[in-house]
A protein has these predicted regions:
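Single conserved hydrophobic/aromatic residue that forms the stacking wall/gate
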Residues: 1-8, 12
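Short beta-strand-to-loop junctions in surface cap/lid or active-site-entrance loops
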Residues: 10-22, 178-182
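Short hydrophobic segments within beta-strands
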Residues: 13, 29-30, 108, 192
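Short beta-strand element of the alpha/beta-hydrolase
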Residues: 21-32
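Conserved HGGG/HGGXW glycine-rich cap/lid loop of the alpha/beta-hydrolase fold
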Residues: 36-38
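Short amphipathic alpha-helix adjacent to the substrate-entry channel of hydrolases
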Residues: 40-59
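Active-site-proximal cap/loop segments of hydrolase catalytic domains
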Residues: 58-260
Length: 260
């Protein structure tokens, strides 16, 4: 398997504004599930970050298929933890290459990427300046145990069936982010969900936030945002998603003490 740090990351920056001296803030995006490839595309919204000195990076980790079908297979079922390890490896590589520094990286992911964010903040909290968990699939074990949820049975092929298979139960309990929250300090977190989300039900981000609030030992900001009119894909309408991005970017910028 190619090392993710050498084969699977895209980095965006404004060359005339950023030196590779480790001082730049970074926003690192990850997904890593279902064989979905996150193509490097142009986004006008990212310019707001780049103009403020950020480096924006995409981690093409296992669970996706950027490097082929096997890359996907190596990030599902019993190989799922490869996805989390790859993401942390990519971050460490970008630090080693002096695009940024440990503790100066904000991270963002949605849905299965939100699960990744939960795992990453537990595995390597010292790396992150802030964490944005969008509609996060953080309570993997309990969701896969509830076959009344409409999407649970079709998802067993991706995560395993803990109802019928003790091996799958033990696997999900070992890595499910919700099950692994411990008493310690965590970076600032923005946790969002949609009340009408049929894929990641609103109580997953709510349970995550409640357990974090009762467990963590720091005073860092922990914000939960539930959109009462949204489903899995957040705000709709012409400007709804722009509003969401604006709020998420403000949270990220303030975590880096950038106020303009």
């Amino acid at each position: 398997t190619p090392k993710p740090s050498s084969a699977a990351s895209d980095v965006y920056k404004r060359q005339e504004r950023i030196e590779r001296d480790g001082t730049s803030p970074m926003l690192l995006y990850g997904y890593g599930a279902y064989g979905i490839t996150v193509s490097p595309t142009f986004s006008t919204m990212r310019l707001s970050l780049l103009d403020r000195g950020f480096v924006y990076a995409i981690a093409h980790i296992r669970g996706g298929s950027m490097l082929g079908y096997q890359w996907y297979l190596d990030g599902k079922l019993e190989q799922r933890e490869n996805t989390f390890n790859d993401f942390v490896d990519v971050a460490n590589f970008l630090v080693d290459q002096k695009y940024t520094a440990a503790g100066n990286i904000s991270i963002v992911g949605r849905s299965a990427g939100g699960e990744l964010m939960g795992a990453a903040v537990i595995q390597a909290p010292h790396l992150w300046r802030s964490v944005n968990l969008g509609v996060p699939f953080v309570d993997v074990l309990n969701s896969m145990l509830d076959e009344s949820l409409p999407l649970t049975p079709p998802e067993w092929k991706e995560w395993g069936n803990p109802i019928e298979d003790k091996w799958a139960f033990d696997l999900l309990r070992r890595y499910s982010p919700y099950e692994n929250i411990t008493t310690r300090e965590y970076p600032p977190m923005l946790v969002s969900g949609g009340l009408n989300d049929p894929r990641v039900t609103y109580w997953e981000p709510a349970k995550w936030t409640a357990k974090m609030r009762s467990t963590k030992t720091d005073n860092n900001l922990l914000v939960m945002r539930i959109n009462m009119g949204a489903g899995h894909f957040a705000n709709t309408g012409r400007f709804g998603r722009f509003k969401d991005y604006a709020e998420e970017y403000v949270f990220t910028l303030l975590a880096h003490n950038i106020k303009q």
